[in-house]
UniProtKB/Swiss-Prot annotation:
GO terms for biological process: tRNA pseudouridine synthesis. This is tRNA pseudouridine synthase D. One of its GO terms (molecular function) is tRNA pseudouridine(13) synthase activity. It is an enzyme of class 5 (isomerase). SUPFAM superfamilies: Pseudouridine synthase. Belongs to the pseudouridine synthase TruD family. It catalyses: uridine(13) in tRNA = pseudouridine(13) in tRNA. HAMAP family: TruD. Its EC number is 5.4.99.27. Residues 156-318 form the TRUD domain. Disulfide bonds: none annotated. It comes from Xanthomonas oryzae pv. oryzae (strain KACC10331 / KXO85).
């Protein structure tokens, strides 16, 4: 069963069913840059529109084109294979002599801009991502769909980690348990894993650690949604500043905090598990600990702590920016919005209803998405 298939909906029951990604053009993602290029330096900054290929493939292609090692190519984030996406890449060219850029253009990618910059593009160096999603075969009452979209724009949504984090049927979480020394039986019980486990590459290990952490966060967020406190304050709340990773509190509830919460300047937060004490206290901490008290969650917690990860926080609430919609046909709905880095468009769709993804990835431990 998928880690995301039974998540609760904060705004009520589903109001539609639909199909997504019937073609790559139905899922368009534009990276929102975090900085202006310097125009100088030895890193060629390329803005690339790609179709039907993942970010790692394009990075390898650029390295081959430039005649450099793959580590000389930088990008801010991974973009989906089954989509039309626009993002930046940096290519290290110390002599500032670039091969023919036009030679890169083909059916899979086109370079739409190029300039120079004085440093390599680092992961996370983006303001966010803009999405244009086209849903087809939409079934549901139009008034109910539009009312739900308006509610999402006004109140926001739970900041779920999307299915991409967990692999097919949540397989990455099961693989993380094996990495931590456990196997899970069909009845949910845990047993020691065989000692002759295969050695994982660093990227595989990192992906499984992320899956374990994300699963625990979603379980805490599930508890908060079920008690309708995902966008409100509990005693002992640790607060996250909107648009940053800065965390403060707990502190006594006040009119000032209430105003900041209402205008989306701050959000309640949940744990990204690791070693160390929870930042939250009192009621908020009790909810977090209670949501993660089952044997599987305890095994994941212990594994993350042993792996050396430290306690961090993630906002429980997310508000899509500039949410707009238009009906292209009677059963075709186009959505447009922007999200901060690390947030999932599928979390927006989940609040609408059951959306079947025709371009569903195969994200096991070998996934490069």
């Amino acid at each position: 069963m998928s880690e995301t298939s039974l998540l609760p909906r904060a705004h009520g029951a589903a109001v539609l069913s639909a199909a997504m990604r019937s073609t790559p053009d139905d899922f368009q993602v534009d990276e929102l840059p975090a900085f202006e290029p310097s125009g100088e330096g030895e890193h060629l900054l390329l803005t690339v529109c790609k179709r039907g290929q993942n970010t790692a493939y394009i990075a390898k292609k650029l390295a081959h084109w430039a005649g450099i090692a793959e580590m000389g190519v930088g990008y801010a984030g991974l973009k989906d294979r089954h989509a039309v996406t626009t993002q930046r890449f940096s290519v290290h060219l110390p002599k500032r002599i670039a091969p023919d850029i036009a030679a890169l253009d083909d059916a899979q990618m086109q370079v739409i801009d190029s300039t120079w910059h004085n440093r390599k593009l680092q992961r996370g160096a983006l303001h966010g991502n803009g999405f244009v999603l086209t849903l087809r075969q939409v079934h549901g009452e139009r008034d109910a769909v539009e009312e739900r979209l308006q509610a999402i724009a006004a109140r926001g949504i739970p900041n779920w980690f999307g299915e991409q984090r967990f692999g097919r049927d949540g397989g990455n979480v099961a693989a993380a348990l094996v990495m931590f020394g456990y196997v899970q039986a069909a009845d949910g019980t845990l047993a020691p894993a065989p000692t002759s486990r295969r050695r994982l590459r660093n990227d595989q290990r990192s992906m499984l650690l992320s899956a374990a952490r994300s699963a625990l966060f979603n379980r805490v967020l599930t508890a908060r949604v079920e008690q309708d406190s995902w966008d409100s304050a509990l005693e002992g709340e640790a607060w996250m500043l909107d648009g940053s990773r800065s965390v403060f509190g707990p502190e006594p509830w006040s009119d000032a905090l209430a105003e900041r919460l209402a205008c989306f300047d701050i959000h309640p937060s949940g744990p990204l598990w690791g070693a160390g004490a929870l930042r939250s206290t009192d009621q908020a901490a009790a909810v977090e600990q209670g949501a993660l008290s089952d044997p599987q969650s305890e095994a994941l917690r212990q594994g993350l702590e042993a792996a050396g990860l430290k306690q961090e926080r993630r906002a429980l609430r997310l508000r899509p920016q500039g949410l707009d919609y238009r009906w292209l046909e009677a059963q075709t709905l186009q959505l447009e919005f922007a999200l901060p880095p690390g947030c999932y468009a599928t979390a927006v769709l989940w609040e609408l209803g059951e959306v079947t993804d025709a371009g569903r990835f195969d994200a096991g431990v070998r996934s490069d998405e």
